[in-house]
Amino acid sequence: MRSMNCTTNNTNNTGQNTKNSLGSSFNSSNYTSYRFQTCLTDQIISEAQTWSLSSLFNFSWVVSYFVMGASRMIFRYGWYLATLSLLRIPKWIFFKLHHVQFTLSFWLILFALAVIVFVTYTIMKERILSQYKRLTPEFLPLENTGKSGSSANINAASTQSANAPPAIGSSTTGASSIIDSKKHSLKDGNENETFLSSYLDQFLSAIKIFGYLEKPVFHDLTKNMKTQKMDEGEILLLDSTIGFAIVVEGTLQLYHEVDHSDKDHGDETDHSDTDGLDDQDRDEEDEEEDDDIDNYDTKSCSSNLIDEEDESVGYIHLKNGLGNFQLLNTVKPGNPLTSLVSILNLFTHSMSSYGNSNFPSELSSPIDTTVSVNNMFCSSEQNFSNTDSMTNSTNSFPTFPSSMPKLVARAATDCTIGIIPPQSFAKLTAKYPRSASHIIQMVLTKLYHVTFQTAHDYLGLTKEIMDIEVLLNKSIVYELPYYLKEAVIRKFKTVDKSSGSADLEPKPKNSNASSKLKKPPKAKPSDGIIQSLKIANANANTSSNSLSLKPEFTHHPSSRHVVLGSRDQFNPGDLLSNVPLSRTMDILSPNPIHNNNRNKSNGINTSTSNQHKRSSRSSSNNASVHSKKFSSLSPELRNAQLSTSPLSLDNTSVHDHIHPSPVHLKGRVSPRPNLLPTTSFSAAQEETEDSALRMALVEAMLTYLGVNKSNMSVSSSSIANMSSLNSPQLNEMYSRRPSNASFLMSPHCTPSDISVASSFASPQTQPTMLRILPKEYTISNKRHNKSKSQDKKKPRAYKEELTPNLDFEDVKKDFAQGIQLKFFKKGTTIVEQNARGKGLFYIISGKVNVTTNSSSSVVSSMSKPEQVSAQSSHKGENPHHTQHLLYSVGSGGIVGYLSSLIGYKSFVNIVAKSDVYVGFLSSATLERLFDKYFLIYLRISDSLTKLLSSRLLKLDHALEWVHLRASETLFSQGDSANGIYVVLNGRLRQLQQQSLSNSNTSSEEVETQNIILGELAQGESFGEVEVLTAMNRYSTIVAVRDSELARIPRTLFELLALEHPSIMIRVSRLVAKKIVGDRTVPALTGDPLSIKENDFTSLIPPTKASYSSSLSHKPQNITSGTITFRTITILPITSGLPVEAFAMKLVQAFKQVGRTTIGLNQRTTLTHLGRHAFDRLSKLKQSGYFAELEEMYQTVVYISDTPVKSNWTRTCIAQGDCILLLADARSPSAEIGEYEKLLLNSKTTARTELILLHPERYVEPGLTHKWLRYRPWVHSHHHIQFSLTGTTLMNEGKMHVLNNGALALMDKLIQTEFSRKTQQNISKLLPDSIKNTVENFSSRFMKSKRQYYTPVHRHKNDFLRLARILSGQAIGLVLGGGGARGISHLGVIQAIEEQGIPVDVIGGTSIGSFVGGLYAKDYDLVPIYGRVKKFAGRISSIWRMLTDLTWPVTSYTTGHEFNRGIWKTFGDTRIEDFWIQYYCNSTNITDSVQEIHSFGYAWRYIRASMSLAGLLPPLEENGSMLLDGGYVDNLPVTEMRARGCQTIFAVDVGSADDRTPMEYGDSLNGFWIIFNRWNPFSSHPNIPNMAEIQVRLGYVASVNALEKAKNTPGVVYVRPPIEEYATLDFSKFEEIYHVGVDYGRIFLQGLIDDDKMPYIPGSQETTLNSQVPEFLLHRRNSI
C-alpha cells in the first residue's frame, strides 16, 4: 500500500510540475529522484514484513489443522477401543462362554492355587513378616565413629576413650595407646630435651614435697641454689651442712653405714624402770620379739644381700678405715637426696642456731656428724683452683678423721645435683615464719604417711614407732601436785559414772563446781606451779651446770587448799579450795624466816603456817616435776609412780650411749627464785583452783610439745634472726659466691657450680665471686622515683598474716580454754587402733596400757576398721583381735602424741588399766591452735626429729614418696622390679598386655590387647612377687587419679629382711594370700597359671568379638569385679539437672546398704577450709581433708553443684574413682554437654557411668543407643526413675527459644485451660459408648501419652540398686537353659519377689536368657507372665513348626517362626534399653569362643543364645555362627561374679546329667544294643546312640562349668524338680509354672528358717547412724 501511495504522490507531483513554469524543471527533477529512492526502500521493507507475517500465519494454521485432526482421530479411535474392550469384547466373551464348556483337573487347580499361595506368602513374608530382619547391627569402623557425630568434640571423645579402659577381665585395644604414649614417670627424661627444661622439670618435681609455695617464698628459697656435677664413682657425704639436695641429672646410689653398733639396737626399746611407764605389766611376748634379730650382725650377712644377677653393687668399702656402707636406695632424677627428717632439721637448726631451741645444738642432728669441716675437706684455696689441676689419684685424698657421716651417696653415672643451702632455710624461717610452718606441716604429714604408716601397716614396726612416745615420757616427767589431783577426783566423784567415762568441758558461764569446771579467767597465772615451770623452761637453756642438779624431792602433804604462790601474808579463807583471792605477788623470797614472820603477824598457828609454807615452797620450787611417790595420798593417787628421769647425766644407762636424746634435758628444775617475774593480780583478776589446774595442765602439755616462753615469740625470734642474718658475718656467708659449704660435695675438692647459669660455663673458667649489696644502699633522686612509679605500677608486696599477740602467755590462755577433763573407768578403750586419733591425753591420775592388735590375717592391719565392722555386722560376727601390750603410762605421762600432731589415725589402742583421770586436748582444738600459733610446728618438729631411732631414720632415708598424676604410668610391663609400692592415697589400675593368637595374621604382626587385672585402692600394696622372685614387672600400673605412694626399695627390703626376719614372714604371708585369692577367681585375672585341671570353661575366655555388636562399642557395661569405689563423683552433663537432690538420695542409699558414706559439696568443703577457702593453701588443705575422709568413710561422694568453670567442678572430676554422668533421658538431643567436655579435657581414666533419669519406669526403644552411640568413654549405664518436674520446665524453656517469656506462659495456660474445658464438654455431650469408641479409634492413629505400670515395692528402689552395684554388693540372678523346663523360672522369680529380694543384674542362657530378658526389661513379674505364655503357645503350635520346616541340611527349620516369636515379644528394644543390667551368652563355633552379649538388639542375641543345634540354624553375626550358650556354660555364674555381684541366685533347669557307668567290653554290636533295649530282664544299662553321644560331647564344658558354679562362694544354687519334663514341652506351661512357684517358696523359706539366707544390703529398715550428716548444708556468706 505504501508503494501505491508513493506512485500516486509521484504522479501528482509530476502533473503539478508540468503545469508550473518550465524554469523550475531542473530542481523538480532532483527532488523527484530523491523521493523515488526513498519510496523504493520503504517498499522493500514493507514487502519483507508482509511475507514474514503471512508465513507465520500459514504455519499456525497448518499446525492447528493437524492438531484438530489428530485429536479428532484419537478421540474417535479411543472411543472405538473403549467400546470394543468394555462392551463388545466382554459381550462376545459372555455369549461365547455361555455356549462353550471345558474341564480342568483337580491337581491342576491345586497346583495353580499352591503357586498363587506360595507367591503371595513369599511376598508377604519378605515385605511384612520379616520386619525383624531390618534390626541388624550396624558396624562402623572405630576410627570413623567420631566423624559421624553431630558434636564437634566427637573426635576428642573418641581419643579420650582410649584413656578409659573397661573393667576387670575385659580387653581393650585403646589402653595400649595410653601406655605407649605415657612417659615413664620414674625413668630419665627425654634425651631430646635441653638441660634447662630437664633441670626445671626435675626441680619442680622434687619440691612437690614442700606443698604450695608463694612466689616470694619460692624466690627466697631458691635464689641461692647451686648445682654440683659429679663424675661416676664419686662419693657425696650427706650431712647437715649440705642442705636440700635434688638429683637433676643422672643416678645416685644412697648408702648407709654398716657398723657393729646396729647390734645394740635391741637395747633401744628396752624401757625399764621408766618414770611414767610401767614395764612390769608387759607380756612375755615382748621378750620373744625381735631382740635376737636386732643383734644380728648386718656386716657378716651383707654378702648375702648381693645378687649375682643384679648389676647394682650391694655395698661399698671405703679406704683408710672410713667404714662399710650398705646400699639403701637408688635415687633417680626428680627425687630429693634429703630425707624428710633432714628437711625438718633444716628448719629447726636454723632456729636453734640463733638460740631459740630448747635443746643443745650438739645433739640437734639425728645423724652423728662429728666430722670437722676444716679437717675433713680441702681448704678454700684448693676449692678455687683450676679444674685442670685436679687429680684423681689416691694420694690426693684428704686425711679423714675416724668418724664419718652414716649416709653417703655414690654417683652411679655422671650426674648433676641441685642444692639449696641451709642458709636459705634460715632466711625463709626468719622472713616468712608462717610459710615455714606450712612447709613443716606438709613434711610432717608426709613423714607420718610415708614413713610411719608404711612401717606400721606394711612392715609391722609399730613398736619402733611407739618408742618415740616412750622416749618422750622417759625424758620429760611433769607431775601435778597431789592436791590438784585430789581436786580433779573430787569433781568427778560427783558426776554420774555409770557410762564408764565422763568429761568436764569448759563453759563460758559459771556453773556448779561439782559438775563442770569454770572457764579460766583472763588473768596471768600464779607463781606457784606455773612459775616453777617457767623456771624449768628457762633453765633448760641457761647452762649445762644447772642440768646436773638433782631435783629436790619433798613430801607433799594431803591438804586441799590452792597454793597461789608465796606471798607476804595469808588472807582469811585460804583453806577453802575454790574461793577467789585477791593478792599481790612479789618476787619470791628464798628466806623462810620472812614468811614465818608474815604468818605470825597474821595470827595463824605456827604449825599450820609452816605446813602451808612447806607446801607452798615445795610446789613453787619443784612444780611437782621429778618428785617422789606420795605417801599420804588418796587411794586413787597411789598408782602414780614418779622417779627421776632415766636420761639424766647421773643415771648412766646403755640407752644413753647408744641413742642419746636431747629432750631429757627438758623438765629439769633448778630453783632460781630470782628469775621469777613480778605478777600482780587485781580484784577482777582472781585465780581459782580450776584456773590453776588448767594452767598446770597446759604447761605440762606444752612442755611435752617442746614449747616454752623463749621460743614462742615471733617478734623476738624474727628480729633476732633478721638481725643476725643481716650481720656482716652472715652476709659474707650468704653472698652468692662459692662458700665452704658448696665444696662439701666431693672429696676431690672439685669446684661446684655456683648457679644454673654457671653450670653452662666452661669447667676451666674460674668461678666468679658475686658481691650483692642490699637495696637500701641505693640513694636516688625523688623525681626519678616518682616518674618511675608513675610509669610502672609497683607490684604488691607479699605479706604474711601473723597473729598480733603471739606471746607465750596468750598461748597458755588459748590452750587452757580448750582443755577438757575426762574420766575413764578401768578397761575402757580410750582410742582404737587404726581409728582417727582423738587428741592429746595427759594422765593426771591412773594408768593406761598402750596395746596393738595381733590378728591372724596379715591384711587385716592394712584394712579399714569401717570395712571390718561393716562386714562383720552383716554376719553377726565380731572381729577378734589379740591385743599385745607395748607399754604402760602412769600419771605425769602423755599418750596420743603422734596421732595428735597432724590429726591422723592412731597406730595403737589406748586402754585404761585402772580408773584414769586425764587432761584432754582434742584434735580439732590442737589444729586450730597450731594454725594460730604456727611456731609450735617448729618446736614439734625439733622435738620429734630427736626422738627418732636409727632404724626409723634409715627408713626415712630409703623410703621414697611417689606422686602420680591422673593417667600417669608408674611402670610398664617388662621393667625391672626395683621396689614394693604401698598406695597411700588415690587409685591405680593394673593392666597386662597379652598377645592374641590369630591364624590370619603373620608371625611378625602379632596383635596385642590389654587385660585389666584389677584396681588398687588406698592401703593396698603391690610388687612383692617381682621383688621376691627377682623378675621383671608382669603388669603395667597406671594412675586412675592423682595418687600418692610409698616406695620400699628392693635393697632396703632385703636389708630389713635380714635385720627383721618377721618382716619377710609377714610379706610372704601377704603374697601367699594374694595368690590364693587370685586363684579362687581365675576369671578376674585371666592368669593361665590359675586354670585348674579339667576346667574347660576357663579355656574359652571372652574375646573382643563378643562385644562388636554395637558400633564397635567396647564391653563397657561390665562393672568392677571385686572393686568397691572409694570416691564417687556426681557430674551433670549439662546445667539445670538436680545434682544435689540426686546425690542426697544416693548417699542415703549407700547408708542403707551398710556403707559409711559422706557427701561433699562446695559448701561442705568451704566450711571445713574456713579462712583458707579462697587462698592458695586451699588445694593443700583439700588434699589432706579428702585423704582423711577416705580413711574415715568407706565411700565419699563428690557433688558437682557449681558452674562448669569453677575449681570445685575440676576437683570433683580429679577426685573421683567413678564418675556418674547425670542426663535427662527425655532430652530431645543427646549432644555432649559442657560438663562432659570438661571431663574429656581432664584426661581422666576413672570409670565413667551414664545415669539416665526417667520420670517413669519405661525406656523408649533405641533411646539408650542414642546416648551411647557417640560416647565410647562411657563404661556402663543405669536407668533411674527420678522426677524432673522442677527442672523439666527449665530445660524446655532453654531448648525452645521462641517460646519464652509471657508468650510461653500464655501458651501453656491456654493449652491446659482449653484442653480441660474441651474434655469436660465432650464428656457431658457424648454418651460413654461413643466417647469410648472415638478414644479407642483415635488411639490407634494418634500418639497419646501412655500410662506405664510402676511397681511400688521397696526392694526395687533404683537408688538402692545403684548403691549396691557401686559398692560391690550387687545381687545377681542367673537363669539357666533347659527348654520348656525354663518356664519354672517364672515361678522362682515370683517367689523371690514375694520375699522382697532385689535383683540388680540378670544373666541367662537359652530359655533363661528369654525369661531373664523380659524381667530385666520391665523389672516386674506382671507384664512378663503373659508374654512368656504367648511365646510358649507359639512354639508349641504344630502348624507353625510345620510351615517352618526345610530341607534338613543344617537344621530342620528355617528359624523364621522362632525369630518372629522372639521379635514379637521384644520388638525393637535393645539390651541397653533394659531397666536393669542384663547379659546372655552364646557359643561362637567359628572362633571357638564364648561370647557375652550386653549390647545390641535383644531379639538377635537372645535368639543366638537359644539356637539349639539341629533344630535351629546358627545365627550369623559378622561372619561368625552363634549357637546356644549352654554348650559352653549353661549357668553363667562366672560372668556374674566378674560383674561384681556378691550374692548370686542361680536357677538350674537343665537336664539331669546321666553318670551311669557302662560295661560292654572293647567292641560293640548294634544288634545287641537293640536287643538289650527291648530285653526287660537285661542287667546292662542302655547304651546311648550316636545322637545322644553328640549331645553329651557338646555339653562337656557345660557340665564342668556347672560344678564350678555350685562351688562358687556367694552362690545360692536352686534346682526345681522338673526332670520329668522334656525340652519341647511348652504346651505344659501352667503345670511347669506352678512347679517353680511351689518349689521357690519352699526353698527360700527353708533358707530363712535355717538362717542360711545371705545378707541382702538395703533390705533392713535401719540405716547406719553417722555422726556427720551426709550434707553439711551451711549457707555460704556473700563475698
UniProtKB/Swiss-Prot annotation:
Phosphoserine PTM sites in chain numbering: S300, S312, S632, S634, S653, S661, S670, S680, S739
Q: Which residues carry this modification: Phosphothreonine?
A: T803
Q: Which PROSITE patterns match?
A: CNMP_BINDING_3, PNPLA, UPF0028
Q: Which UniProt keywords apply?
A: Endoplasmic reticulum, Hydrolase, Lipid degradation, Lipid droplet, Lipid metabolism, Membrane, Phosphoprotein, Repeat, Transmembrane, Transmembrane helix
Please verify whether the record's keywords include Transmembrane helix: yes
**Binding residues for a nucleoside 3',5'-cyclic phosphate 1, per the UniProt record?**
803-947
Q: Which InterPro entries match?
A: Acyl_Trfase/lysoPLipase, cNMP-bd_dom, cNMP-bd_dom_sf, LysoPLipase_patatin_CS, NTE, NTE1_P-loop_dom, PNPLA_dom, RmlC-like_jellyroll
Per the UniProt record, one Pfam family is: NTE_Ploop
Disulfide bonds listed in the record: none
- The residue spans the entry assigns to the Lumenal side of the membrane are as follows 71-103
Q: Where is this motif: GXGXXG?
A: 1377-1382
Annotated membrane topology: Multi-pass membrane protein
Q: What else is known?
A: Present with 521 molecules/cell in log phase SD medium.
Q: What does this protein do?
A: Intracellular phospholipase B that catalyzes the double deacylation of phosphatidylcholine (PC) to glycerophosphocholine (GroPCho). Plays an important role in membrane lipid homeostasis. Responsible for the rapid PC turnover in response to inositol, elevated temperatures, or when choline is present in the growth medium. NTE1 activity impacts the repressing transcriptional activity of OPI1, the main regulator of phospholipid synthesis gene transcription.
Q: What is this protein called?
A: Lysophospholipase NTE1
Species of the source:
Saccharomyces cerevisiae (strain ATCC 204508 / S288c) (Baker's yeast)
Give the encoding gene's name. Answer: NTE1
